[in-house]
A protein has these predicted regions:
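Long, C-terminal-biased catalytic regions of enzyme "large/alpha" subunits
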Residues: 1-212
């Protein structure tokens, strides 16, 4: 608060973090070897080498400068779409690389790739240890996790055992547009008793249930 407009800010930087983030590891691997890390062990090994090198560079800069350089697994929802549009203008639509509306966030296995939850967790887990400025991994459940607590617990334990530092389980939540009920609706709304056969469609609202 006492810093003037012409004062040096070098000392202030020592109290913060200088993070480098990245997106699109999956597309990078597709461009380099034709497979992403969800598709082969070879791609996973290369992915860990790439992210490991970025972390090494951050550690080296920290040692050289005494500043807190860190590596961030960026959840860049807006940037992932903006960057791919820029690259499409330059390189066109390259299959598996720039042919979608977005790049995959950070080190994530692409959301369009069919993969078991446990396998996705095991692939992404090692990257959490490399990204010391922040990271998150998601998996999705088909329905209400309270109806299958064993599966939910198995996912959480798998995250723990795989080194996931910050994990999230996504599941669908329905909204009845007539009575406004929010929750899991099977065939009958728990609040008003209305069924989908009454010519009103329910609206699906995604909700995220975060688990440390």
């Amino acid at each position: 608060e006492s810093v003037g407009p012409d004062d040096c800010v070098a000392e202030i930087l020592k109290h913060g973090t200088l993070s480098m983030g990245f997106i699109g590891l999956a597309e990078c691997l597709k461009a380099l070897i034709g497979e992403h890390h969800g598709e082969s062990e070879k791609a996973q090994k290369l992915g860990l080498e790439i992210v490991g090198y970025m972390r090494q560079r951050m550690d080296e800069k920290s040692a050289q400068t005494g500043l807190n350089f860190t590596l961030l697994a960026t959840p860049a929802e807006g940037l992932s779409g903006r960057f791919v549009k820029i690259d499409q203008q330059v390189y066109g639509k390259i299959p598996g690389v720039t042919d979608r509306d977005y790049y995959t966030n950070s080190f994530h296995v692409p959301v369009y790739y069919p993969i078991a939850a446990a396998k996705k967790i095991q692939i992404e887990g090692p990257y959490h240890n490399l990204t010391n400025a922040g990271h998150i991994s998601y998996v999705e459940m088909d329905g209400d996790p309270s109806h299958n607590l064993k599966a939910f617990e198995a996912i959480i334990r798998c995250m723990h055992d795989s080194g996931i530092g910050y994990g999230s389980v996504n599941h669908p939540v329905d909204r009845d547009p007539i009575c406004g009920y929010n929750g899991i609706i099977d065939n009958v709304c728990p609040r008003c008793g209305r069924t989908e056969a009454e010519h009103h469609q329910r609206i699906i609202i995604p909700r995220m249930n975060c688990c440390d």
